[in-house]
Amino acid sequence: MQLPTISRTALKDVGSTAGGTVFDVKLTECPQALNGQQVGLFFESGGTVDYTSGNLFAYRADSQGVEQVPQTKADNVQANLDGSAIHLGRNKGAQAAQTFLVSQTAGSSTYGATLRYLACYIRSGAGSIVAGNLRSQVGFSVMYP
């Protein structure tokens, strides 16, 4: 998913967010046994995860979104999921990620869930922010009973 272009001034203070964009992860054709059960995403650890803030490091990219080589972290800006620290990469209980109810798909005999998240930019430091394209990523697994 792609966040919108924002002005550097939209991120005035450390912790301020901008460019919030909703994205969905849709689960389809779930087994009937999951009907009424809670499912969620477990965000994996990796090189893009800032374990201190719970956000994703943002890396400089070219105009096509291709990361610079070697990777260069953007100063004082990161990517945030869900408007609060999810503690990406930590164990399931410590992540505090939301869960979603599996239900029957309207007009169908199948079951599924739509997992809705919000991604945004977040100011992570007090120094200057350099304009440019940024990129980040995180792996995830689906958690279910």
From Swiss-Prot:
This is Protein FimA. Its main location: other. SUPFAM superfamilies: Bacterial adhesins. It is found in: Fimbrium. Disulfide bonds: none annotated. GO terms for biological process: cell adhesion. Belongs to the fimbrial protein family. One of its GO terms (cellular component) is pilus. Keywords: Fimbrium. It comes from Bordetella pertussis.
